[in-house]
Amino acid sequence: MPTQLEMAMDTMIRIFHRYSGKERKRFKLSKGELKLLLQRELTEFLSCQKETQLVDKIVQDLDANKDNEVDFNEFVVMVAALTVACNDYFVEQLKKKGK
């Protein structure tokens, strides 16, 4: 039986491939595919954001090779960065509560 971390990794891989390759290259997310992924899979995160051009900024920041698409490595960097930010927020909330 897979561990929770193994299931989380499997979920990330499956989500990436569910959205990638519909518009262009099979193993990359176009800007439109990434936008759809973010809207459907990170609903809470996006609802708290005030920046209207957030998806464009995310693509620009993630697109290390400047091909205007996001590959799996670039996608994982985004998920990791968001996870770190969420953890930082969680730790700050615990500190405020004195735990």
Swiss-Prot record:
Amino acids binding Ca(2+) 1: S20, E23, K28, E33
InterPro entries recorded: EF-hand-dom_pair (IPR011992), EF_Hand_1_Ca_BS (IPR018247), EF_hand_dom (IPR002048), S100/CaBP7/8-like_CS (IPR001751), S100_Ca-bd_sub (IPR013787)
Boundaries of every EF-hand domain copy: 13-48, 50-85
Gene Ontology molecular-function annotations: calcium ion binding; calcium-dependent protein binding; protein homodimerization activity
Top-level lineage group: Eukaryota
Binding-site residues, Ca(2+) 2: D63, N65, D67, E69, E74
Pfam families: S_100 (PF01023)
SMART domains: EFh (SM00054), S_100 (SM01394)
Keywords attached to this entry: Calcium, Metal-binding, Repeat
Tissue note: Highest level of expression in spleen and leukocytes.
Keyword Disulfide bond: no
Gene3D superfamilies xref list: EF-hand
Coiled coil spans: none
Subunit structure as annotated in this protein's UniProt entry: Homodimer. Interacts with S100P.
Name of this chain's protein: Protein S100-Z
Organism: Homo sapiens
Lineage, top ranks: Eukaryota, Metazoa, Chordata, Craniata, Vertebrata
Gene transcribed to yield this protein: S100Z
